[in-house]
Amino acid sequence: MSSPESALPPALLLLGPTASGKTASALALAATLPVEIISVDSALVYRDMDIGTAKPSAAEQAVCPHHLIDVVSPEEAYSAARFCAEASVLMRDISARGRIPLLAGGTMLYFKALRDGLSDLPPADPVLRRAIEERAAAAGWPALHAELARLDPDAAARLEPTDAQRIQRALEIVTLSGAPLAASYARREDAPLPCRLLPIALAPSDRAVLHARIEQRFDQMLAAGLVDEVAALRERYVLQPQMASMRCVGYRQAWEFLDGEIDRATLRFKGIAATRQLAKRQLTWQRQFRDQWPELVELDCLAPDLPQHVRDTALRLLGA
């Protein structure tokens, strides 16, 4: 007997670490299948952030419809909850048009939230966030980490005293909910998905080769004007270095360079190191997915004919 999920229209998922060839593989799928691409990338949502995010070019975006790119200002926050809500609507609409949603990107939290549902967490509170930031500016994030340790020892134990983003969110949740993080995460909101998910993951057979790709791509970003892009963003928008957009890899380091905190050689070194750390975290997520998601198919992102492998795998998953 078929499951209710098997009656749903299909949605392809293409996930992988930075510099793994996701864009080229997604466009190869678009040349074969009637797909519309839904970006699963917490950096591509920001307008005017093109170089450091490796945003698909106008020509690449013209190959097929792209969604969830350039949807918010760099001054705004964009959450996993908003992604899930917007991606679900898009998946339903794309399927209704007789086309196939292709969710491609490297923000693994978004993939997990889409698959497993979201915890019932309170939404961001701008006033409370500003108050926390002001206290951090006066006392330092380690002091706020100590405060979190008094309110929620388990949450604080999982965070470094300098992890500003997560300390801020943890304090926000504990303050708004009046309960430890674990209690909030235990409450889940599971909305049924409009599609059955067919996941393809890209992973390197040789981590050193991926690291070399990352180094080359970061050098290309610098040559293309990453620093000038960040300078223009600072002129155009009211930004702070702790904002989510400016915490993106490359942007954080360019901000430090523009503030005179580091020289260009250090910018390059720190940018490459941060990108490698990002790739490591992404691959850690993927290993968890591989263990928990039996239908996931993993391909070597270093294979010379990767786009063909992705096409063949997608066709097999679709039963075409």
From Swiss-Prot:
List the cofactors. Mg(2+)
> Which reactions fall under this protein's catalytic activity?
adenosine(37) in tRNA + dimethylallyl diphosphate = N(6)-dimethylallyladenosine(37) in tRNA + diphosphate
Disulphide bonds in the chain: none
Q: Where is this site: Interaction with substrate tRNA?
A: T107, R129
Q: Which domain of life is it from?
A: Bacteria
Reported EC number(s) for this entry are 2.5.1.75
Q: Name one GO biological process term.
A: tRNA modification
Q: Which family does it belong to?
A: Belongs to the IPP transferase family.
Q: Subunit notes for this chain? A: Monomer.
The name this protein goes by in its record: tRNA dimethylallyltransferase
Organism of provenance: Azoarcus sp. (strain BH72)
Q: What is the lineage of its organism?
A: Bacteria, Pseudomonadati, Pseudomonadota, Betaproteobacteria, Rhodocyclales
Q: What is the gene name?
A: miaA
